[in-house]
Structure formats: C-alpha cells, structure tokens
Design a protein with these regions (language model features):
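A short, conserved alpha-helix within the catalytic core of class I
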Residues: 175-189, 196
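Conserved beta-strand signature within the Rossmann-like core of class I S-adenosyl-L-methionine
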Residues: 190-205
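A short SAM/SAH-binding and catalytic strip from SAM-dependent methyltransferases
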Residues: 165-179
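Short alpha-helix
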Residues: 220-247
C-alpha cells in the first residue's frame, strides 16, 4: 500500500502540518465524533498553492546552505533544537551501536532530517529513508540523490533496499483513517524502535475524531483528525513494544503543537 492510499486525506500530508510552522497558536478542533466518516462528512474543501513546489524550494535552500532548516515549506535562518526527537534518535543510535538508519514515514523532503542533523553526533553515520507520495518521491530522487536522503513509495520498497533501526512517524497517524495499518507495518518491519511524535493523546476513555480548522490567514481548509485515548492506544501497542520514554511536547520550548501532543519512543519486545 502506498502512502497516498493509506492516508485517506482530504489534503496532502505535508499541507496538513504546514500552517503549524508559521502560525504559533494551536489549531481549532470542532466536534467529537465516534467515526472517521462522521468527521470527514463535516469537513469541507481546501484551496492552497502548490505545496510540493514550496517545500522543494525550502528544502533546496537548506541543502545549499541558504537556510538552516525547513519546516513544511517555511525556511528558518538559525538552527532550532527539537529536543525530544533528537534525544530519541540519539538513544537509538547509542543502543544499536552502529550507523543510524531511519525510516521516515510521511517525511516530505527530509524536514526532520535537516532540523535534527546539526544536533546529532557528527561521528554517527546516518541514512534517512523517506516514504512519501509519488510526487515527493520523484522530486526527492531528482534533487537530493547526493545527500543521505533516499525516497520510496512504500515501506516495503524501502525495507527491500536495507534494514532500518527506527521507524519515525511525525504528525502522521492522526490523519490516517486506519492508524492500525501503520502499526501493523511497524511490527512487520525490521525496525526495533518506533518513534511516534506530534501524537495527540487524551484521557477520554475512547478515541474520537474531530474536524481540524486551519486559520483563514493561512488558507481555507478543514479536515478530519483522530484524538487517541492514551490508555487505549498503549493497550494496542504494549503487546509488541515496551516504552522507552514518553515526553510531553509542551515541555519543549520550541514545540509548535497543541497541548496533549507527545513523543513516544518504543522498543520491540524481545
């Protein structure tokens, strides 16, 4: 299954996250629906520019040294530490004792790589494989073949090329109609570690879907998103994983995510 078919989105995954980079206040969520279909039925259409072109422009600026990093098409002049993610990646690198081989599901053109790399040990050899939609894969292969980034259309394709140490899903699973699909993929993969970050957790007793509203100053869009019950999600995963650490992203000064978003670093049960 490709990323495009898995996401079932009203809009591309990079667009789902783009406004967070430039709009500091949390997005607005309306409703609490038992099913994805109910939330999707209440979500409207969107109008936005060519996101790939904007992301590519930003990523090329980073590659050439004209920007420090890019977050969803917006470039930044100075490095910015994403402490929880860097800590998780550093832990994996130390635990595996070899090169750090990352499988980044929905990773655009390497935004997490470009932001994290300056803060990771320069002695760690990194390969960073990204699973994305076909247009991002094509752009990535054309423009970033001379970097540690590699681009694939499916997890299976990436796994056929090499084994990996960690599967990274940053701000992704809440926009999957069936998040369990990605959990199954993670379990079947070679990755002993699984990083879930920008993960929205609540203590409501059950999962629910809401309609996320993008601030009109960015663009007009509404789309469905899951909020996961913390205990229910952990019950779903704990048979296959043990928790290495659980970080509230609001403790990170540079977080651009609403309250309740966390990073989980999980290790497969031996």
């Amino acid at each position: 299954m490709t990323l495009k078919s898995a996401l079932r989105l009203v809009l591309p995954p990079v667009l789902v996250k783009a406004y967070r980079a430039v709009f500091p206040r949390p997005p607005e969520f309306r409703g609490a629906y038992k099913t994805w279909a109910e939330a999707k039925a209440r979500a409207g259409s969107y109008a936005a520019p060519d996101i790939l072109a904007r992301v590519l422009e930003g990523a090329l600026a980073v590659k050439s040294g004209r920007a420090a990093f890019e977050r969803d098409s917006v470039t930044f002049a100075r490095p910015e530490l994403n402490g929880p993610l860097v800590a998780a990646l550093s832990y994996v690198a130390s635990a595996t004792g070899g090169p750090l081989r990352v499988l980044d599901f929905g990773g655009a053109l390497g935004a997490s790589y470009w932001q994290s790399r300056p803060f990771l040990s320069p002695t760690v050899n990194i390969t960073w494989d990204i699973v994305e939609q076909p247009n991002f894969v094509a752009a990535g292969r054309e423009h970033f073949a001379d970097t540690p980034l590699r681009f694939f259309g499916t997890i299976q394709e990436a796994e056929a090329a090499t084994e990996h140490d960690v599967l990274l899903a940053s701000g992704v699973i809440q926009y999957l109609e069936n998040p369990g699909w990605l959990f199954d993929q993670a379990k079947a993969s070679s990755c002993p570690y699984f990083i879930l970050t920008r993960l929205p957790l609540q203590e409501t007793g059950s999962d629910y879907a809401a309609v996320e509203h993008v601030p009109p100053s960015i663009y007009q869009a509404t789309y469905p998103a899951w909020f996961f019950d913390r205990e229910a999600l952990w019950r779903r995963l704990r048979g296959d994983y043990e928790m290495v650490f659980d970080v509230d992203l609001q403790q990170n000064n540079n977080s651009v995510d609403p309250p309740g978003h966390v990073l989980w670093l999980l290790r497969k049960q031996r």
